[in-house]
Amino acid sequence: VALLFLVFALLIASPSASPTNEGTPVYFTVRPGMSVSSIGKELHERGVIDSEMKFWWTAKLNGLENKVKTGTFAMQTGMTPRDALEKLVYGNTVTIRFVIPEGFGVKEIAERLEKEGLVRADDFMERAKTFRPYPYIEQHENVRYAAEGFLFPDTYELSDSFDADSIMTMMAENFDHRLTKEMRDRAKEMHLSIYELVTLASLVEKEAYHDEDRPIIAQIFLKRLRLGMPLQADPTVQYLLDEPKEDLLYSDTEVASPYNTYQNVGLPPGPIASPGTASLMAVLHPAHTNYLYFVADRNGKNYYATNYADHLALVDQVR
Protein backbone atom coordinates (compact mmCIF):
# COMPACT_ATOMS: atom_id res chain seq x y z
CA VAL A 1 0.00 0.00 0.00
CA ALA A 2 2.83 2.37 0.93
CA LEU A 3 4.43 1.65 -2.44
CA LEU A 4 1.15 2.40 -4.23
CA PHE A 5 0.86 5.78 -2.52
CA LEU A 6 4.49 6.52 -3.39
CA VAL A 7 3.84 5.77 -7.05
CA PHE A 8 0.83 8.11 -7.13
CA ALA A 9 2.72 10.76 -5.17
CA LEU A 10 5.45 10.65 -7.82
CA LEU A 11 2.80 10.73 -10.54
CA ILE A 12 1.22 13.83 -9.02
CA ALA A 13 4.58 15.50 -8.58
CA SER A 14 5.60 14.88 -12.20
CA PRO A 15 5.13 17.80 -14.60
CA SER A 16 1.94 17.82 -16.67
CA ALA A 17 1.87 18.22 -20.40
CA SER A 18 0.32 21.57 -21.22
CA PRO A 19 -2.72 21.60 -23.52
CA THR A 20 -2.32 23.49 -26.78
CA ASN A 21 -4.83 26.11 -25.52
CA GLU A 22 -2.86 26.89 -22.39
CA GLY A 23 -4.03 30.11 -20.73
CA THR A 24 -7.51 30.36 -22.27
CA PRO A 25 -9.96 31.73 -19.64
CA VAL A 26 -12.55 29.26 -18.38
CA TYR A 27 -15.44 29.91 -16.01
CA PHE A 28 -15.98 26.72 -14.07
CA THR A 29 -18.96 26.10 -11.78
CA VAL A 30 -18.91 23.62 -8.91
CA ARG A 31 -22.52 22.65 -8.33
CA PRO A 32 -23.90 21.44 -4.99
CA GLY A 33 -23.38 17.71 -4.52
CA MET A 34 -20.57 17.35 -7.06
CA SER A 35 -17.89 14.83 -6.09
CA VAL A 36 -14.16 15.40 -6.50
CA SER A 37 -14.09 12.76 -9.23
CA SER A 38 -16.91 14.44 -11.21
CA ILE A 39 -15.22 17.84 -10.77
CA GLY A 40 -11.94 16.40 -12.05
CA LYS A 41 -13.72 14.82 -15.02
CA GLU A 42 -15.31 18.14 -16.07
CA LEU A 43 -12.06 20.06 -15.54
CA HIS A 44 -10.30 17.56 -17.78
CA GLU A 45 -13.04 17.69 -20.44
CA ARG A 46 -12.77 21.48 -20.57
CA GLY A 47 -8.97 21.46 -20.83
CA VAL A 48 -8.30 23.03 -17.43
CA ILE A 49 -6.23 20.03 -16.29
CA ASP A 50 -4.60 17.19 -18.19
CA SER A 51 -5.46 14.38 -15.76
CA GLU A 52 -8.55 13.79 -13.67
CA MET A 53 -6.71 10.98 -11.84
CA LYS A 54 -3.95 13.36 -10.69
CA PHE A 55 -6.64 15.79 -9.54
CA TRP A 56 -8.40 13.09 -7.51
CA TRP A 57 -5.21 11.84 -5.86
CA THR A 58 -4.05 15.37 -5.07
CA ALA A 59 -7.33 15.93 -3.22
CA LYS A 60 -7.13 12.51 -1.54
CA LEU A 61 -3.55 12.80 -0.31
CA ASN A 62 -4.12 16.31 1.04
CA GLY A 63 -7.47 15.59 2.70
CA LEU A 64 -9.30 18.08 0.48
CA GLU A 65 -12.00 15.83 -1.02
CA ASN A 66 -14.74 17.62 0.96
CA LYS A 67 -13.17 21.09 1.02
CA VAL A 68 -14.05 22.24 -2.50
CA LYS A 69 -16.45 25.20 -2.46
CA THR A 70 -19.55 25.53 -4.60
CA GLY A 71 -19.72 28.47 -6.95
CA THR A 72 -18.19 29.78 -10.16
CA PHE A 73 -14.43 30.22 -10.43
CA ALA A 74 -12.30 32.09 -12.97
CA MET A 75 -9.80 29.48 -14.17
CA GLN A 76 -7.81 28.82 -17.32
CA THR A 77 -6.69 25.94 -19.48
CA GLY A 78 -3.33 24.34 -18.79
CA MET A 79 -3.47 24.50 -14.98
CA THR A 80 -1.79 21.79 -12.92
CA PRO A 81 -4.17 19.59 -10.92
CA ARG A 82 -2.74 21.04 -7.69
CA ASP A 83 -3.25 24.66 -8.82
CA ALA A 84 -6.78 23.88 -9.99
CA LEU A 85 -7.63 22.19 -6.69
CA GLU A 86 -6.22 25.05 -4.61
CA LYS A 87 -8.28 27.51 -6.67
CA LEU A 88 -11.46 25.57 -5.90
CA VAL A 89 -10.63 25.22 -2.19
CA TYR A 90 -9.04 28.57 -1.34
CA GLY A 91 -9.93 30.84 -4.28
CA ASN A 92 -12.75 33.36 -4.56
CA THR A 93 -15.90 32.70 -6.53
CA VAL A 94 -17.01 35.18 -9.17
CA THR A 95 -20.23 36.67 -10.48
CA ILE A 96 -20.75 36.37 -14.22
CA ARG A 97 -22.51 39.01 -16.30
CA PHE A 98 -24.81 37.11 -18.65
CA VAL A 99 -26.75 38.66 -21.55
CA ILE A 100 -29.81 37.19 -23.28
CA PRO A 101 -30.60 39.08 -26.50
CA GLU A 102 -34.18 39.53 -27.66
CA GLY A 103 -35.25 36.61 -29.82
CA PHE A 104 -33.15 33.95 -28.12
CA GLY A 105 -34.89 30.63 -27.56
CA VAL A 106 -34.40 28.09 -24.80
CA LYS A 107 -31.84 26.16 -26.87
CA GLU A 108 -29.73 29.26 -27.57
CA ILE A 109 -29.91 30.38 -23.94
CA ALA A 110 -28.87 26.91 -22.78
CA GLU A 111 -25.92 26.78 -25.17
CA ARG A 112 -24.69 30.20 -24.07
CA LEU A 113 -25.00 29.26 -20.39
CA GLU A 114 -22.94 26.13 -21.02
CA LYS A 115 -20.33 28.13 -22.94
CA GLU A 116 -19.96 30.39 -19.91
CA GLY A 117 -19.51 27.32 -17.73
CA LEU A 118 -22.65 27.96 -15.68
CA VAL A 119 -24.85 24.94 -16.35
CA ARG A 120 -24.99 22.05 -18.77
CA ALA A 121 -27.14 22.85 -21.80
CA ASP A 122 -28.91 19.49 -21.62
CA ASP A 123 -29.84 20.05 -17.96
CA PHE A 124 -31.24 23.50 -18.74
CA MET A 125 -33.28 22.31 -21.73
CA GLU A 126 -34.64 19.34 -19.80
CA ARG A 127 -35.81 21.58 -16.94
CA ALA A 128 -37.34 24.03 -19.44
CA LYS A 129 -39.70 21.32 -20.71
CA THR A 130 -41.81 21.40 -17.53
CA PHE A 131 -40.99 24.81 -16.02
CA ARG A 132 -44.29 26.60 -15.29
CA PRO A 133 -43.91 28.94 -12.27
CA TYR A 134 -46.93 31.09 -13.19
CA PRO A 135 -50.49 30.03 -14.04
CA TYR A 136 -50.49 32.01 -17.31
CA ILE A 137 -47.83 29.63 -18.68
CA GLU A 138 -50.37 27.29 -20.18
CA GLN A 139 -49.91 23.59 -20.72
CA HIS A 140 -50.43 22.54 -24.32
CA GLU A 141 -49.70 19.40 -26.26
CA ASN A 142 -46.69 19.45 -28.57
CA VAL A 143 -44.99 22.38 -26.80
CA ARG A 144 -41.24 21.81 -26.84
CA TYR A 145 -40.37 23.87 -23.78
CA ALA A 146 -42.89 25.16 -21.26
CA ALA A 147 -40.46 27.98 -20.39
CA GLU A 148 -40.08 29.14 -24.00
CA GLY A 149 -40.89 32.84 -24.31
CA PHE A 150 -40.99 33.51 -20.57
CA LEU A 151 -37.24 33.80 -19.94
CA PHE A 152 -36.98 37.56 -20.30
CA PRO A 153 -34.14 38.87 -22.50
CA ASP A 154 -31.95 41.05 -20.32
CA THR A 155 -28.54 41.38 -18.66
CA TYR A 156 -28.21 39.23 -15.56
CA GLU A 157 -25.64 39.12 -12.79
CA LEU A 158 -25.55 35.41 -12.06
CA SER A 159 -24.26 34.66 -8.60
CA ASP A 160 -22.16 31.60 -8.03
CA SER A 161 -23.68 28.17 -7.45
CA PHE A 162 -26.81 28.96 -9.52
CA ASP A 163 -28.31 25.86 -11.12
CA ALA A 164 -30.66 25.56 -14.10
CA ASP A 165 -33.77 25.97 -11.96
CA SER A 166 -32.58 29.08 -10.12
CA ILE A 167 -31.40 30.76 -13.34
CA MET A 168 -34.72 29.99 -15.03
CA THR A 169 -36.64 31.26 -12.01
CA MET A 170 -34.75 34.57 -12.05
CA MET A 171 -35.51 35.09 -15.74
CA ALA A 172 -39.19 34.17 -15.36
CA GLU A 173 -39.55 36.48 -12.36
CA ASN A 174 -38.04 39.26 -14.46
CA PHE A 175 -40.64 38.60 -17.17
CA ASP A 176 -43.47 38.66 -14.64
CA HIS A 177 -42.17 41.96 -13.25
CA ARG A 178 -41.89 43.52 -16.74
CA LEU A 179 -45.43 42.47 -17.62
CA THR A 180 -47.13 45.49 -16.06
CA LYS A 181 -50.76 45.77 -14.98
CA GLU A 182 -51.39 48.04 -17.95
CA MET A 183 -50.04 45.41 -20.33
CA ARG A 184 -52.12 42.67 -18.72
CA ASP A 185 -55.24 44.85 -18.86
CA ARG A 186 -54.62 45.71 -22.50
CA ALA A 187 -54.22 42.03 -23.42
CA LYS A 188 -57.54 41.33 -21.71
CA GLU A 189 -59.20 44.13 -23.72
CA MET A 190 -57.89 42.49 -26.90
CA HIS A 191 -59.20 39.09 -25.76
CA LEU A 192 -55.67 37.73 -25.70
CA SER A 193 -54.41 35.48 -22.93
CA ILE A 194 -50.91 36.21 -21.66
CA TYR A 195 -49.81 32.99 -23.33
CA GLU A 196 -51.24 34.11 -26.68
CA LEU A 197 -49.67 37.54 -26.25
CA VAL A 198 -46.22 36.07 -25.67
CA THR A 199 -46.62 33.55 -28.49
CA LEU A 200 -47.58 36.26 -30.96
CA ALA A 201 -44.88 38.63 -29.68
CA SER A 202 -42.27 35.91 -30.18
CA LEU A 203 -43.21 35.73 -33.88
CA VAL A 204 -42.96 39.52 -34.17
CA GLU A 205 -39.57 39.40 -32.43
CA LYS A 206 -38.20 36.89 -34.92
CA GLU A 207 -39.66 38.65 -37.98
CA ALA A 208 -38.84 42.30 -37.24
CA TYR A 209 -35.34 43.65 -37.82
CA HIS A 210 -36.30 47.25 -37.00
CA ASP A 211 -38.49 48.70 -34.26
CA GLU A 212 -40.70 50.55 -36.73
CA ASP A 213 -41.68 47.23 -38.33
CA ARG A 214 -42.91 45.58 -35.14
CA PRO A 215 -46.38 47.23 -34.90
CA ILE A 216 -46.99 46.68 -38.63
CA ILE A 217 -46.05 42.99 -38.50
CA ALA A 218 -48.12 42.57 -35.33
CA GLN A 219 -51.10 44.12 -37.10
CA ILE A 220 -50.69 41.79 -40.09
CA PHE A 221 -50.60 38.71 -37.85
CA LEU A 222 -53.61 39.87 -35.82
CA LYS A 223 -55.56 40.55 -39.01
CA ARG A 224 -54.69 37.13 -40.44
CA LEU A 225 -55.85 35.49 -37.23
CA ARG A 226 -59.19 37.32 -37.47
CA LEU A 227 -59.59 36.34 -41.13
CA GLY A 228 -58.69 32.69 -40.50
CA MET A 229 -55.63 32.91 -42.75
CA PRO A 230 -52.42 30.98 -42.05
CA LEU A 231 -49.77 33.24 -40.51
CA GLN A 232 -47.10 31.78 -42.85
CA ALA A 233 -44.31 32.92 -40.54
CA ASP A 234 -40.92 31.55 -41.60
CA PRO A 235 -39.52 31.57 -38.02
CA THR A 236 -42.06 28.93 -36.97
CA VAL A 237 -40.58 26.61 -39.58
CA GLN A 238 -37.01 27.58 -38.65
CA TYR A 239 -37.90 26.63 -35.06
CA LEU A 240 -38.39 23.04 -36.22
CA LEU A 241 -34.98 22.76 -37.87
CA ASP A 242 -31.86 21.55 -36.07
CA GLU A 243 -29.94 24.42 -37.65
CA PRO A 244 -31.58 27.58 -39.10
CA LYS A 245 -31.36 28.13 -42.86
CA GLU A 246 -30.72 31.41 -44.59
CA ASP A 247 -33.46 30.57 -47.07
CA LEU A 248 -36.24 28.07 -46.49
CA LEU A 249 -37.11 25.62 -49.22
CA TYR A 250 -40.69 24.97 -50.26
CA SER A 251 -40.30 21.45 -48.87
CA ASP A 252 -39.45 22.94 -45.46
CA THR A 253 -42.83 24.65 -45.33
CA GLU A 254 -44.56 21.31 -45.88
CA VAL A 255 -43.18 19.65 -42.75
CA ALA A 256 -45.92 18.18 -40.59
CA SER A 257 -45.89 19.97 -37.24
CA PRO A 258 -48.32 22.06 -35.17
CA TYR A 259 -45.62 24.77 -35.18
CA ASN A 260 -45.74 25.05 -38.96
CA THR A 261 -47.86 28.15 -39.60
CA TYR A 262 -47.83 27.44 -43.34
CA GLN A 263 -49.77 24.22 -42.80
CA ASN A 264 -51.91 25.26 -39.82
CA VAL A 265 -54.27 28.16 -39.20
CA GLY A 266 -53.87 30.06 -35.95
CA LEU A 267 -51.00 30.44 -33.52
CA PRO A 268 -48.37 27.74 -33.00
CA PRO A 269 -48.68 25.69 -29.77
CA GLY A 270 -46.51 28.16 -27.87
CA PRO A 271 -43.84 30.86 -28.13
CA ILE A 272 -40.76 30.18 -30.26
CA ALA A 273 -38.39 32.65 -28.55
CA SER A 274 -38.13 35.26 -25.81
CA PRO A 275 -39.72 38.51 -26.98
CA GLY A 276 -38.55 41.85 -25.63
CA THR A 277 -40.77 44.65 -24.37
CA ALA A 278 -40.90 46.31 -27.81
CA SER A 279 -42.45 43.23 -29.43
CA LEU A 280 -44.91 42.73 -26.57
CA MET A 281 -45.98 46.37 -26.88
CA ALA A 282 -46.28 46.03 -30.67
CA VAL A 283 -48.86 43.28 -30.24
CA LEU A 284 -50.72 45.29 -27.60
CA HIS A 285 -50.64 48.45 -29.73
CA PRO A 286 -50.50 47.35 -33.38
CA ALA A 287 -50.37 49.73 -36.33
CA HIS A 288 -53.46 50.67 -38.32
CA THR A 289 -52.85 49.69 -41.94
CA ASN A 290 -54.48 47.65 -44.68
CA TYR A 291 -51.42 45.45 -45.14
CA LEU A 292 -51.84 41.69 -45.22
CA TYR A 293 -48.46 40.56 -46.55
CA PHE A 294 -44.79 41.38 -46.02
CA VAL A 295 -41.39 40.20 -47.19
CA ALA A 296 -37.88 41.17 -46.04
CA ASP A 297 -34.81 41.72 -48.21
CA ARG A 298 -31.28 40.56 -47.37
CA ASN A 299 -30.69 43.65 -45.23
CA GLY A 300 -33.80 43.14 -43.12
CA LYS A 301 -35.86 45.88 -44.76
CA ASN A 302 -39.52 44.90 -44.94
CA TYR A 303 -41.83 45.55 -47.88
CA TYR A 304 -45.60 45.43 -47.37
CA ALA A 305 -48.55 44.67 -49.61
CA THR A 306 -52.33 44.67 -49.30
CA ASN A 307 -52.92 41.90 -51.85
CA TYR A 308 -51.25 38.70 -52.97
CA ALA A 309 -50.38 39.88 -56.50
CA ASP A 310 -48.46 42.88 -55.18
CA HIS A 311 -46.80 40.66 -52.60
CA LEU A 312 -45.52 38.26 -55.27
CA ALA A 313 -44.11 41.21 -57.22
CA LEU A 314 -42.26 42.36 -54.09
CA VAL A 315 -40.92 38.86 -53.50
CA ASP A 316 -39.48 38.81 -57.04
CA GLN A 317 -38.03 42.27 -56.47
CA VAL A 318 -36.21 41.61 -53.20
CA ARG A 319 -35.10 38.02 -53.83
Residue positions per predicted region:
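N-terminal type II signal-anchor transmembrane helix
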Residues: V1-G23
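Short, structural beta-strand-to-alpha-helix junction motif
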Residues: S35, T80-P81, G105, D163
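Bacterial extracytoplasmic/cell-wall-associated proteins, especially those involved in peptidoglycan
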Residues: S35, I49, V99, R112-R120, ...
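Extracytoplasmic/periplasmic/luminal assembly and interaction segments
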Residues: S37-K87
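Surface-exposed aromatic
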Residues: G23-T24, L64-F73, T93, G149-F152, ...
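N-terminal post-signal-peptidase region of extra-cytosolic proteins
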Residues: G23-V26, W56-K60, V68-T70, T93-T95, ...
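Conserved "repeat-terminator" motif of extracellular CCP/Sushi domains
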Residues: A74-N92, S159, I167-D176
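Glycine-rich loop/hinge motif
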Residues: P25-M34, K41-E42, T93-L118, K188-L192
